[in-house]
Structures are given as structure tokens and as C-alpha cells.
Amino acid sequence: QATRLMMLIDGKIREVNLNEKIIYETIVPDVAKFSMYGSELAFVKKLNADKKFVISIFKLRDMGEIKIDEVDESVGINQIFVNLTEFYGEKYLNTVIGQSLRVYSTDDYPNHDNENTSLNLALEKTLEAVPSEFYTSANGEFFMGVSGNKVMLVNLELMELLQFEHNNNTIRQLDYYLMFDVVDGKMQVYDFDHDNQRTILEKVADGFDAVINHNNRYLYYVGTNDSGLQIKRDKLF
């Protein structure tokens, strides 16, 4: 909810109520990093006594976490990523350990109320490089990562991994199937597979997101003029 969020505070996932300015009790302790989608959390716990990072998931209000995998300490925490999403009624868990990528699918994540649910390995690939970041796209349809100028993208509809070179690591999502970048003040748009490049706008400021409104009629972005920066709107059709 907009007034309640999850934060990692001193290695503890805690719920924060922004309206009442309350930080609730710890939900999960000893966490190094986490991601969230809906009411589910996926996280990597700090090194345990066995020198392992533990990847787990947790459904809010459940009795406890469910362990998914263990990772040896030889793999640094900055090379481990976990992400969740839901697409067309199917739920997905993505793990990246070094260059090893896995995508699991399920009708419902395992939890203590229904331990019969299971994760199905839908995709397993070796990445061409260790990513510096890996995340769920804004529309929940892709898992995306970057390593220098290399972009890695998991298309959940086709359940395939795409890897391609871009001229920088600032390419990002514009809408469901489009990605964009700003090069020399021009907004360049690409299909999700990096094909069909075209320039759609000029005098665009770099370093800012751009969004298309809900009915796909207007594009909002940060432009430049003689006075500096300005929020602009362009009609798409």
C-alpha cells in the first residue's frame, strides 16, 4: 500500500506505516537484501554459521520463511539477486547466483499453510557476464539485468533469455514492450529485444524516467530548453 512499505533496517525487514509514523516489529531478521511483489518477500539472508547465504521466500502473515537454496560464501552477496513477479496469473521467482540464472514458476509460492505447493524450474541459463544489478521490470513481465554495456532480459511470455550489447547501461523500460535511452539529447526507443531502434524525441534530458499514461495517448518526460529542465507531455496519437 502507498502508506505502508517494507524496509531493510539494520539487517531486518520491517514494516513502516507512513501515516502513523510507526515502525513495526521485525518480520525477518539477518537479511542482506530482499525484493517484494504483492504480499510475498524473497530475500538473501546473511552468512550463517555454515558460511552459507540462504535464499528464502516469505508470505506476509505466514508462520515463517521457506528456504529455497543455499549459496557458498565464495559467491559474494553482490553477485546474488532474487526477484518476484506475477504474470497472467502465474507467479515467478528469479534467482541469479554469479552467472547462473534460474526462473521458477508456480500457481502459489510454498508457505506453511500449503506445503504441497512447489516451484517448477521453468528456465535455467548461464549469463554471459556477472550482472551488477538484476530486477523485475516495472510491468512485471520481464526480469532484467545489466553488466557494463551488456543487457540481460528474461521474457516471461516466451520464457527465453535475451542478451545483447547496448552503448551504455542506462537503457530502461518505457512501457510493456518498449525500452528507451537518451543519447545526445535524443530519446531512442527499442523493442524489448533491442531491435527496431528509432528516435522519437529531441531535446530530452538524460537521467530521468519517462512514462506513458494508462491509455497510451501521452508520453511524459523531462526535456530541456533555454531556461533549463522542464516536464513535458507529447501526444502519441
Give the positions of each predicted feature.
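Blade-level signature of beta-propeller repeat domains, shared across WD40, Kelch, NHL, RCC1
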Residues: 207-237
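Repeated scaffold domains used in trafficking and secretory/extracellular systems
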Residues: 1, 27-40, 74-86, 122-138, ...
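Surface-exposed loop/turn elements that mediate protein-protein interactions on large endomembrane-trafficking
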Residues: 8-27, 50-75, 98-128, 146-165, ...
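Structural hallmark of WD40 beta-propellers
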Residues: 3-4, 90-92, 141-142, 177-178
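Residue position within the beta-strands of beta-propeller blades
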Residues: 7, 42-44, 93-95, 144-145, ...
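Charge-rich, low-complexity intrinsically disordered segments
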Residues: 88-102
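Secretory/export targeting leaders with adjacent low-complexity proregions
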Residues: 6-9, 18, 33-45, 90
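N-terminal "mature head" segments of proteins
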Residues: 1-2, 13
